[in-house]
From Swiss-Prot:
Subcellular location: Secreted
Family per similarity comment: Belongs to the plant thionin (TC 1.C.44) family. 4 C-C subfamily.
Protein's UniProt name: Hellethionin-D
A biological process from GO: defense response
Organism name: Helleborus purpurascens
Gene Ontology MF, one: toxin activity
Intrachain disulfide bonds: C3-C40, C4-C32, C12-C30, C16-C26
Keyword terms: Disulfide bond, Plant defense, Secreted, Toxin
Length: 46
């Protein structure tokens, strides 16, 4: 599960992934993180 700081970061991440970017690369570029749980931390709610 990916978690982003806000909607802008989420849109960035989705666009990055759509164009073939890897999860780690898109996470770094768009300030998103990946979690193994079903909920996101408060620092990355989106």
């Amino acid at each position: 599960k990916s978690c982003c700081r806000n909607t802008l970061a989420r849109n960035c991440y989705n666009a990055c992934r759509f164009t073939g970017g890897s999860q780690p690369t898109c996470g770094i570029l768009c300030d998103c993180i990946h979690v193994t749980t079903t909920t996101c931390p408060s620092s990355h709610p989106s």
